[in-house]
Amino acid sequence: MGLAHETKKKSIRDNYFLKAFFLGLGLSFLVFLPFIVVDGGRFLFYGDFNVQQVPFYRLAHDAVRSGNLGWSHLTDLGANFIGSYSFYLLGSPFFWLTIPFPSEWVQFLMGPLLILKFACATLTGYVYIHRYTKSKDTALIGAVLYAFSGFSIYNIFFNHFHEAIVFFPLLLAALDEYMATRRRGLFALAVCACCVVNYYFFVGQVTFTLIYFFLRLICKSWRINLKDFLLLALEAVLGLGLSCVLLVPSVMTVLQNYRTSEYINGWNAVLYNNVQRYLHILTCFFFPPDLPARPNFTPDSGSKWASLGAWLPLFGMTGVIGWLQMRRKHWLKKMLWISFLMALVPFLNASFQMMNSAYYARWYYMLTLMMARATVLALENDRVNWRRSITWCLVITTAISLVIGFMPTFETVDGAETVSYGLEDYPTRFWSYVAIALVSLAAVVYLFCFCRKHKKLFYRSTLVALSLISVFYSIFFIALGKTQSEYTWDHLIPYSLNGSKDVDLPGLQESRSDFYESLDNAGMFWGIPTIQAFHSVVPGSIMEFYDSIGVPRDVGSRATADHYGIRGLLSVHWLFDDDHDDSYFAGKDMSDPAIPGFAYYGNASGFDIWENLYYIPLGFSYDYYITRSEYNALSEGSENAIGDRELALLRALVVEDDRAQYYDGILQHLPEDQRAFNEENYLQDCLDRAERCCSSFEYTNTGFSAQIDSNRKQVVFFSVPYEDGWSAQVNGEPVAIERVNVGFMAVTVPEGEGVTIEFTYRTPGLTLGFGITLVSLALLVAYLMLMHRLPQKAPPRRGPSLLRVGKFSQYAKSRHTSFRRPGALTLHVTREAAVPSEEDSPPPKETPRQSSQSESEKGE
């Protein structure tokens, strides 16, 4: 019994998969714990993490728990919930871990989930790397290098990027397993998982995996026959099909975004138009990552949110350079050179994101996995010249540091010439990064000088040093990030994360609110509809609307107070102005509101509250209409100036030219003498529209419903974005939905009191995607059953290198050897004397062990 217990304990202790997971868990716990304690149990960072990741998680969590999976009225002016949030979190298993917990707990789960992600990335990194290492300890080192690389730490800012970091090694591991053992099904499941967790990153993973696969075939690292190749392709297709339940709705949503059609071309596809970007790419391999939105080494590289981070803690590029300098031919060397080339050529870099023109390096986690693998292989290879690789790394690091740190800049200010030294924006931060890189190199030198002779000691010491550097530089990075935003206890924690508990206003959920110069996505924190949003994936009709009135809409809806017209059109009732900042909605004396029609109401939860006295409830009708071409002829406006188009939207319904005849019998064409637009007329238009609005309006889990008293047949407008998934009923009868006012919806209602209007939303592509998923699942099961029944041939294996036939010169080159004379290699066998006959041979001598054994036998 004791022996069995001891064996079990030993097997658990020797389980390096568990070691990898718990090592990653422990290191990430040390990284995040100080910040979780400081923020009262929450992990808060800065920028996108605070204003996107945190509110998105809570919004989606509440939507799933309430069953509101169709239309999200809390996202911008309204959005397809599945299409908008599949990019961020819907496919993430980490998000679904929050569902059993109450809504108030979500903010406290962000830190533990990040810790879990780092632990899982360490585990999956080990799963991939351990196949290729001689020692499990070096595989563990490689796993930590991957999980805590500069890319991973940089993208704490983008919390949802870590799902791709976690799952990508499983894709390569499944492919490796197929090629080594022909094990069926794993690759299909890995493809499905990678596509489900994030379709954007999946595009880059497909590109990288194709290069990985065909390069290894070309280099003869793998062999595959036609049958197995076709079966592998079938698994890839089935895996893609399995993911269609999320993929199809997501693609249908993303295709509405104009940013997806901006392809790289011309000289921009050949060379980066900003020369600093080349240096930024180089520095990301030799130094810890810059903060997102705060590039320091190259301030004007145009790469603020590009995810340029690929530094391997402790080792940097030493192991990679050492591996690349070996003369041995290996597919990994070619893979690394190809990857570095693709990073430097714009159109090759863009191939990881469907050739989009926007610059991002969000595929570098795949490159860091290859770099981590090369580093640990170099550690195990005695022929690697570490002295030379460390020297190269030191020279490059020092050169970059000296050039950026001391380069003089001459300027003439008020007639006097001044000189400044250093190209960086933040010298203290810059020299801190330099110090971390140089201390890491010094630690590597120490390890090789004093620990290299004893392998076990060397690997353990390396792992300890790697862990210390990883924890230290990660804490330093997060601490720097937190200095870029205001103290979280000033406003974010007490007022935003409290969920508007102290705000009690009439109609807050049935109208939209406006947050003046406030935190992005402030309405999401409170769970109320707003006209502001910081969200990349929204209906194309929203972008079309804002574009038509001159308001930029790329990743956020942030119409300034100059655009007062849309406040009436979009049914804004309440405006919130931070009472702790220097941006005053009505001036310091609160006597001159920036938007006409607003009056001070009171103060609550850190905000001055203003009420729109000319508020128009959602759902109202018009007397007049104008065509789209007439609308386009009006002045557009700009980012900080209102145009006639915006004001015309409250005077007349804008209809498409080909539908004008339909509206002639219901509405009047706007007369020429009523086409003067100004602030005074705007307020009167608001009063006119409010007189003919719905008596009630309510959001539902399937859309929204309203009721109106109609004195005649009329068109009722709703400022809800138009999408193909909408259907409508009036008094229980289906009616057609009209696309009006450049991207919004309207229905025709009959005369009568208490006319009910019901809008229902069904996610476009969800049914089709679900059907494809079911069919793919059935085909995968049938495929696996068929493969199980058929006799399987063992995959071809390459024999030992000594038995391979190859060129004599190649052998000499790969082994770093030279021969005194050319010619074939001849094996000289040591000659032995002829075996004597049994008669002449003396009896064999008895060994002490045999004699003692015979004596014991005799004793028995």
Which positions does each model-derived feature cover?
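Start-transfer (signal-anchor) and selected internal transmembrane alpha helices
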Residues: M1-I36, L231, L457-A465, A778-P843, ...
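Membrane-interface helix-loop-helix junctions at transmembrane boundaries of multi-pass membrane enzymes
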Residues: W222-L230, G319-A343
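Contiguous transmembrane helix-bundle modules in multi-pass membrane proteins
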Residues: R182, F201, W331-L497, E751-S809
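Soluble catalytic regions of membrane-associated enzymes that act on cell-envelope
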Residues: P100, Y426, S432, F458-Q714, ...
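Membrane-embedded helix bundles of polyisoprenyl
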Residues: G24-S28, F118-R131, D137-I218, L231-V251, ...
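Active-site lumenal/periplasmic loops and adjacent helix-entry segments of GT-C-fold
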Residues: P34-Y132, D137-P169, A193, V197, ...
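Active-site-proximal, structured, solvent-exposed surfaces of multi-pass membrane proteins
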Residues: E6-K10, Q53-F56, A660, G665-K807, ...
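Periplasmic/ER-lumenal interhelical loops and adjacent helix-loop junctions
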Residues: V51, P55-D62, P93, D228-L232, ...
